[in-house]
């Protein structure tokens, strides 16, 4: 089983990209589990047809320790398995700690056992590596591969660079590696060249450039992935291509993060200044 974590700046489109990619893998016949590591609990909504799923932490609060796997894992599109860690009540506790609790419980209940015949587990992780809890999939070897969703905007690239620093920090202990950058286009000038240059400087690859298309929003309004909502649409093929590239990927590296000055120079050389 391949264990993958998707990181990136908040609002970059991680959950949408993850769910559409997972739909592409599931369509290929892969058995995939998605673990939402975000207090918003929106990492599996499109795979579940918009059904709001009771989170692991909510279930623990309501049921106590007497929890079955079926209480927290739901079947989604094309035999995917979906679970959401959730978070603490607003203003109380630590959401990162909730991720640790949730993943540990899933392991105790046998969610990742061999008899489940999983090909992939995807961890969709909130925002930047803001604290130890959110870094947990990297830190404790829960994820082997990291893909960073990025765009040509400065803050998205800054977050990607920070995440690379987290990967470097835990590469020896957890054995985690960077699989590549996924450019989720914001239609910034020279965006593809900019992210290709960033990937090269980090020592990785831009594994796929996902063009911006309103079909993604249309599908989301219908609470579906593009692959389920409009399987013949060119945007569905973009996510299939990304899924296939991840499936075939052999390039796993310890990245080489840039200084803030190097990052700004990259933007000047390749970005909107030209």
UniProtKB/Swiss-Prot annotation:
Its EC number is 1.18.6.1. It catalyses: N2 + 8 reduced [2Fe-2S]-[ferredoxin] + 16 ATP + 16 H2O = H2 + 8 oxidized [2Fe-2S]-[ferredoxin] + 2 NH4(+) + 16 ADP + 16 phosphate + 6 H(+). Its cofactor is [4Fe-4S] cluster. GO terms for molecular function: 4 iron, 4 sulfur cluster binding; ATP binding; metal ion binding; nitrogenase activity. Transmembrane segments: none annotated. It comes from the Bacteria. [4Fe-4S] cluster binds at residues 94, 131. One of its GO terms (biological process) is nitrogen fixation. Signal peptide: none annotated. Belongs to the NifH/BchL/ChlL family. NCBIfam families: nifH. Homodimer. This is Nitrogenase iron protein.
